[in-house]
Amino acid sequence: MGPVLDWSANFAHSLHRCAVRDLSHIGWWLVALSLAAAEPGGGGYRAEIQKWREGYEADLKKDNGWLTLAGLFWLKEGNNTFGTSAENDIVLPKGSAPGQAGAFLFHDGKTRLRLKDGVRALVNGDPLRTKSPAEIPLNPDTTGKPDRITLGRLSMIVIQRSTRFGIRLWDNNSAVRRDFPGSQWFPIHEMFRVTAQFTSYAQPKMIPILNVLGDTEQNPSPGFAAFKLEGKTCRLEPLLEGDHLFFILKDLTSGKETYAAGRFLYTTMPKDGKLILDFNKAENPPCAFTPFATCPLPPKQNHLPVAVTAGDRKPAHGTASH
């Protein structure tokens, strides 16, 4: 989570424009997935899954992780003032910043930052003072390298979703982070580690992906995974995630034992037409923890006809729901 896209090679720009998901956690996940996983059939496999889960939760709880997300503010044309005063367009958490800290100047899809005199901030880790220069252009997340503003314990970036631009806010003093009870997991069952047959498309197939904002974007899928689970024939279409695959899926537990909007699963690339799908690593999307994420929803073809009682359960009381 914590993610959170950041998309790979030739698909990077098209998927950034789609901006269907958030990938702040992806660095940790790619490292974890690249480690040699223990083969199932003993304590080594269970230990590997447990270690993966510990890393997943640590990533959720880190500074500027998903549990610290504290706001999403859509920009209007012109000045968008920010600070802790209620008079601002973007109201920051009480006690976190000056009452009038500055403004985001938004015009024709471009965003610039202007600070009030005397306000100290960092942009990409470098100190920024007013009048040096007075206005700073900001790259949105769809460029793959968003400019990050740090204001005390807060940080902000510009995000783009379809035709909308907004300010994403993190607060490292977030009560959600402080009170997080930990993830709820199903017991580890090796039957949910399956070998799938992967069929590559001659050319990437564009599939529509709806997100929680109601936006639908076309995204390329490299192929599909076919497998049997509990006697049922199943099929999933992934998106590309760097040199890995990203599955957005639902199953018969969704809305009951697991998060209603579905779960995510990441895998390495197929080898010799085979792909390992380990549903013990199925995880909740960021929207399970915060209303300020912009997660994608599973396409209809990724609704499994079985109950996958493995991986992340429904979040504990007090977390977000969609």
Q: What does each of the following model-derived ranges do?
A:
Residues Q197-T253, Y259:
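Flexible, glycine-rich surface segments
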Residues A38-F73:
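N-terminal pre-domain segments of enzymes
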